[in-house]
């Protein structure tokens, strides 16, 4: 187990965030020890806005045994989702194609039910192991209340591993599906971002609504509504959380959109 003081801007895809004590755990016993004081869990740092003052709690990151995987068995929650998508395709296993391009670890993808219009994480789950109240518990997906970009994990629960529901299919068919998903994601920005900023209202596109209001390019400090896709806030270099939050506020003055990101603290 490694404990160090860090700036969380170096661990988030938006490149924003203040100081914290980072606990990198590699075994189940280390995880038990790390959770003996108040904590938060950090995955790949996407879909997350950390405030400039940082967080007082321990920040736990899963490594070691939590990054091992077997596509036909248990998959560690610290495994990168893009890696799994590619490995499944190579093995001729279908079920993850709709998650192509999501820069998450498995645990974070489960917690927020990450997805695209082509599919959600919950669709690919057979079982989920969650650590809470000092023990490891296995749940079926139906017990975790998955919905649009959300789940209902037990309070303080940490996803530790999952079993995937994959089907054998011809590789050519899987690759065609992945190419379709990739084409749909081409308009997304290449600059630092935390992913889609706002949840899509029922039957509508948040990005399209933002575009129609002429908000693309709106900027506060180095935080800007992407010119490429209205539902992305990008970091032009030195953005701070306060800049991002002010930008969010200005968008929400114009449109009744719900922020999709988690905000710490």
Swiss-Prot record:
Taxonomy, superkingdom: Bacteria
Cofactor(s) the record lists: FAD
E.C. number(s) listed in UniProt: 1.3.1.98
Region of interest (Disordered), ranges: 182-203
GO biological process, one term: cell wall organization
Pathway: Cell wall biogenesis; peptidoglycan biosynthesis
Keywords annotated in UniProt: Cell cycle, Cell division, Cell shape, Cell wall biogenesis/degradation, Cytoplasm, FAD, Flavoprotein, NADP, Oxidoreductase, Peptidoglycan synthesis
Database matches in InterPro entries: FAD-bd_PCMH, FAD-bd_PCMH-like_sf, FAD-bd_PCMH_sub1, FAD-bd_PCMH_sub2, MurB, MurB_C, MurB_C_sf, Oxid_FAD_bind_N
Its biological purpose: Cell wall formation.
Name of protein: UDP-N-acetylenolpyruvoylglucosamine reductase
Organism: Thermus thermophilus (strain ATCC BAA-163 / DSM 7039 / HB27)
Highest classification ranks of the organism: Bacteria, Thermotogati, Deinococcota, Deinococci, Thermales
This protein's encoding gene: murB
